[in-house]
């Protein structure tokens, strides 16, 4: 026991017997070693973390950094160095892609509705029903002129407004109107058609101009269906009675040339030309002659001075049928206008019949019902063995017994 205690006390004694200078140096070296080990560990850990998050120049980034970090602005390109030698070309800097700033979003234009009283029947844009009423009928957009009901405006007010519609197209025209006033420098040339390199007129332009001219001619030649064409009668009379009647009205339809009366072959004329000065003579129409014979189906009382009164069974010589609803005809010495659906054409070989006894026939079996004094047209030679004649009256056609008909 005494030996062990002695051995344990030996290092203490050695420590106590060591000089104080050596003890301080030993403590300093241990402290330095500990600090070095700590600094080395921290350096290794920091490097490993940096290599993990910032590998090869920020190849991997956390999603938060990608979303939150703003894009680094590129430095402005350095100006090229001024070369002293003018003969050597200066190298142009390669264009680097510059990020374009995003265009600001335009605000969506919505409808701006205001109260409107519609003079014409207008459908609702949402429910497609007519807007009716006397006061405060509905709403209309101030920009695009869209009409809606008061109760339909809430659903359509959040839609985008297309804006003001263009007015380059007009009704009854398939192309924009080319009605620009010519400049004073080229006042003589009213319209210069676009020509190509070869000097030919553009076919598209030619087609559009032809269609526009046809539309204008049709609108000027045909009057409205609700009024009698009194004005066109006076214009035609002035044009046809001028001179010897050689001037033909330009308002007549293209189909009038088919029904032109043949020129008279009489050699009587006010002027006699020498045989050497006789140019090729064109057939001239002195007046619009009768074209076809028609029969009146119904009674028509004249409404204006230039109208022609009709009685059922009257024979009418057609003079002008350029208008679809009002025709010009002649009965004896009377000339005037009458409704086109009040007459029926009488072809060569046909007879005009008047019903003297009413007859009711089955339409499915090919018979036609007639009332008393009704006018119809048919061929007497078409009488079959049973005594029926095939006649027509307006849009109706069928077989009628010959005993109930009387020829006019």
Swiss-Prot record:
Task: Supply one GO BP term.
Answer: positive regulation of voltage-gated calcium channel activity
Question: Coiled coil where?
Answer: none
Q: Pro residues: which segments have biased composition?
A: 70-82
List GO terms (cellular component aspect). cytoplasmic side of plasma membrane; cytosol; sarcolemma
The modified positions for Phosphoserine read 48
List the CDD domains.
C1_Stac2, SH3_Stac2_C
Q: What terms describe the molecular function in GO for this protein?
A: zinc ion binding
Task: List zinc finger spans: Phorbol-ester/DAG-type.
Answer: 110-161
- Give residue spans, biased composition: Polar residues: 19-29
The record's account of tissue expression is:
Detected in cerebellum, forebrain and midbrain, and in the eye.
* Segments for region (Disordered): 1-29, 64-97, 219-286
Source domain of life: Eukaryota
- Topology relative to the membrane: Peripheral membrane protein
Low complexity bias locations: 219-232
Q: Which SUPFAM superfamilies match?
A: Cysteine-rich domain, SH3-domain
Keyword Zinc-finger in the entry? The reply is yes
For this UniProt record, give its keywords in alphabetical order, as a comma-separated list. Cell membrane, Cytoplasm, Membrane, Metal-binding, Phosphoprotein, Repeat, SH3 domain, Zinc, Zinc-finger
Q: Where does this protein reside within or beyond the cell?
A: Cytoplasm, Cytosol; Cell membrane; Cell membrane, Sarcolemma
Q: Name one Pfam family in it.
A: SH3_9
Domain SH3 intervals: 289-348, 351-408
Share what the entry says about its subunit structure, partners included: Interacts (via SH3 domains) with CACNA1S. Interacts (via SH3 domains) with CACNA1C. Has much lower affinity for CACNA1C than for CACNA1S.
Q: What does this protein do?
A: Plays a redundant role in promoting the expression of calcium channel CACNA1S at the cell membrane, and thereby contributes to increased channel activity. Slows down the inactivation rate of the calcium channel CACNA1C.
The extra comment attached to this record reads: Up-regulated in cerebral ischemia.
Entry protein name: SH3 and cysteine-rich domain-containing protein 2
Q: What organism is recorded for this protein?
A: Mus musculus
